[in-house]
């Protein structure tokens, strides 16, 4: 027999979900079924929580305590960069490997870096900004009309100042 269920125990499950969509509850079932939760209801909660991330893949953190699931969205750097581009959501099933060609301002990149600070391994905000610029390069967008690589080189050369925190 499995051990008795402790109502005060907190379980944390992280999974990737597409924003605004109810994922296949069959994928959720093995993870949350043993905890006494309905996969269908949790799937709807995830869809509600990821509503403003329509069409983007985001990491979702499920905190389960006392048979209640709290859903929180942990956005990735690429999701934040794409969101900053303010492009309309595209159909993921039809278009694969989308290259984004709009431009993001450097101030928005710094704001994204501040948001991502808790996940970054860098010591200073400057390092996190460089990480986000690398993500912007892989997404295929520009920063203030220039290539993210050129902006990175300008930061290394000291031409662009990154604020301390």
From Swiss-Prot:
InterPro entries: Ribosomal_uL11, Ribosomal_uL11_C, Ribosomal_uL11_C_sf, Ribosomal_uL11_N, Ribosomal_uL11_N_sf. The keyword Thylakoid does not apply. It is found in: Cytoplasm. GO terms for molecular function: large ribosomal subunit rRNA binding; structural constituent of ribosome. Transmembrane segments: none annotated. GO terms for biological process: translation. Its main location: cytoplasm. Keywords: Cytoplasm, Methylation, Ribonucleoprotein, Ribosomal protein, RNA-binding. The keyword Aminoacyl-tRNA synthetase does not apply. GO terms for cellular component: cytosolic large ribosomal subunit. The modification N5-methylarginine is found at residue 67. Component of the large ribosomal subunit (LSU). Mature N.crassa ribosomes consist of a small (40S) and a large (60S) subunit. The 40S small subunit contains 1 molecule of ribosomal RNA (18S rRNA) and at least 32 different proteins. The large 60S subunit contains 3 rRNA molecules (26S, 5.8S and 5S rRNA) and at least 42 different proteins. Component of the ribosome, a large ribonucleoprotein complex responsible for the synthesis of proteins in the cell. The small ribosomal subunit (SSU) binds messenger RNAs (mRNAs) and translates the encoded message by selecting cognate aminoacyl-transfer RNA (tRNA) molecules. The large subunit (LSU) contains the ribosomal catalytic site termed the peptidyl transferase center (PTC), which catalyzes the formation of peptide bonds, thereby polymerizing the amino acids delivered by tRNAs into a polypeptide chain. Belongs to the universal ribosomal protein uL11 family. This is Large ribosomal subunit protein uL11. It comes from Neurospora crassa (strain ATCC 24698 / 74-OR23-1A / CBS 708.71 / DSM 1257 / FGSC 987). The gene is rpl-12.
């Amino acid at each position: 027999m499995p051990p008795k269920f402790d109502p005060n125990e907190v379980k944390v499950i992280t999974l990737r979900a597409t924003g605004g969509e109810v994922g296949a509850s069959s994928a959720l079932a093995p993870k949350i079924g043993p905890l006494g939760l309905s996969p269908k209801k949790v799937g709807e909660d995830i869809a509600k929580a990821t509503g403003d991330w329509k069409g983007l893949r985001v990491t979702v953190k499920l905190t389960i305590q006392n048979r209640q699931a709290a859903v929180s969205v942990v956005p990735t750097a690429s999701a934040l960069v794409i969101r900053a581009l303010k492009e309309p959501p595209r159909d993921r099933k039809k278009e694969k490997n989308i290259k984004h060609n709009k431009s993001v301002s450097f101030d928005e990149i710094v704001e994204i870096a501040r948001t991502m600070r808790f996940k970054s391994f860098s010591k200073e905000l400057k390092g996190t900004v460089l990480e986000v610029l690398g993500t912007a390069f892989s997404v295929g967008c520009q920063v203030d009309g220039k290539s993210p690589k050129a902006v990175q080189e300008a930061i290394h050369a000291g031409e662009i100042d990154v604020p301390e925190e």
